[in-house]
Amino acid sequence: MKITSRDLIIDYGHCVEKITSFLRYYLNKNGLKGYVMGVSGGLDSSVCLKLVAQGVGSKRVYALLLPEVATPTEDMEDALTLVKSLKVRYDIINISDIVESVRRSIPIYDVDDRVADGNIKARVRMTILYYYANHLGYAVLGTSDKSELLLGYFTKYGDGGVDLLPIGDLYKTQVRQLARYLELPSRISEKKSSPGLWKGQLAEEELGFTYEEADPFLYAIFDLGLNPNEA
């Protein structure tokens, strides 16, 4: 049985309705005032921002732009353009000094271990997001997708440290299609995925395969229950 990307096509209108209604339900059920989330200007966070603003209204959303020295300028420009267009409250906090302070505090810090160093950045961002959430009575909205979750391609207690994942049941290729459905700018919907933890980092180069290759395989195993040899 050969699974292809065509097998992952879904009704994106229905998908948007399900996600936005759940976002409203989650706030009401838990007595929360709104959502706070990190917005990087990348595909996943942009889709999540559009969905949550549409679902609960821009006044109940707080976006945090958390750049540091390795953050591409164009990503911050895309993030800023999007939050302004959606009329979402936002703050820009450059985390470079915080990250450098953590580095200096670690006796065994190794400048050449870019994975461990990159994860410091992700965890600093998580800490800031949860300060806002605690102070405002908000929930932290995560932006990881199903492909990243199944591949383990996230930072534990970093971008994995959230309260809910609205696109956590959508594969990366589906999120890209959803971005087009939501009419996000093409420079976002077609942007190459990157965790943004060091300069030049690209997800597919680091993984060694494309999401177009991985998603049908993951779908066959985890959704259809097929043996890997059958996928």
Language model feature labels by segment:
Residues 1-154, 231:
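ATP-dependent adenylation/nucleotidyltransferase module used to activate substrates
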Residues 14, 18-22, 170-181, 223:
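A non-catalytic, amphipathic alpha-helix used as a structural packing/dimerization or gating element
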Residues 84, 117-125, 139-216:
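Catalytic subdomain that performs nucleotidyl-dependent activation
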Residues 106, 183-186, 221:
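Conserved NTP-handling cores and scaffolds of large molecular machines
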Residues 183, 226-227:
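Residue-level recognition of oxygen-bearing side chains
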Residues 203, 228-230:
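Charged, low-complexity surface segments at secondary-structure and domain boundaries
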Residues 214-226:
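Short, amphipathic alpha-helical "recognition" segments used to contact nucleic acids or chromatin
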